[in-house]
Amino acid sequence: MLAVASQREKRQPERSYLIGMYRHLDDEKIIETLQRLRGRIVERFPGSSLSKVSEELLTVAREAASHVQYLASPSWPIRASVGLAILVMLAGVGAAVFRIRLIPGSGGWPELVQGVEAAINDVVFIGIAIFFLLTIETRMKRRRALRALHQLRSIAHVVDMHQLTKDPEQLLSNPPSTASSPVRTMSKGELGRYLDYCSEMLSVTSKIAALYVERFDDPVTLSAVNEIESLTAGLSRKIWQKITMLNV
């Protein structure tokens, strides 16, 4: 009984670790997946433009890993500067309130009312300034995240451009070509593989985008990530319609 209980205790931390693994995205696993995908593309279509796009996407994924670390880590210099600025402003407000006096024989209450009104205005403006200072770090991180997400959005469109002329209907029906028709040298199997690789690249692109909100809670960045996920899902659906035509 003791041996069984001991084995259960040993398995419990391992089970908890495995459960935790599947509740969060792992940037290293995404990079490994993309490396394998790039290798498959290079081996199947050496020297192709799609292989170069996969290489660029791998570079962006590695950059995303460092960006995610930056987004998740507190920026202590910024926080210290903001804290100091807030203390200075609060000290100024305290000094202004302390100077308000009710002077007998010199207007009294009217002067006090004016002083209180001025103090309230100062408090409102200082509150706005404090809010601005407290959101500096988030806005700086958001700017970096949105810049990186814009690159991912562009890559998704580039992948879509690569599959744009890959028309299975042209391959299956073999209509006469014109002077402006794209050169088609792929077999049915190669075209299916090419389209499948494009779909996989779009899927990985959306996963890289999701990394940016894994440990960075910002609604603006989350909205941008959702847009990329919707974009890649829509583009992937178009690709799978072509793959379905090939398999009919």
Q: Positions of the model-derived regions?
A:
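Short, charged cytosolic
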Residues: 22-29, 37-65
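N-terminal amphipathic/basic-hydrophobic helices that include classical n-h-c signal peptides
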Residues: 1-20
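Alpha-helical transmembrane segments and their immediate juxtamembrane boundary regions
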Residues: 66-140
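Solvent-exposed, non-transmembrane helices and loops of integral membrane proteins
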Residues: 47, 146-188, 244
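Cytosol-/stroma-facing membrane-proximal "stalk/adaptor" domains immediately downstream
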Residues: 205-248
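Mature extracytoplasmic or organellar-lumen-exposed domains after removal of signal/transit peptides
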Residues: 51-69, 96, 186, 193-212, ...
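Amphipathic alpha-helix face/heptad-repeat signature
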Residues: 26, 30, 53, 119, ...
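Short, charged/polar, low-complexity loop and linker segments
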Residues: 36-41, 107, 127-136, 178-186, ...
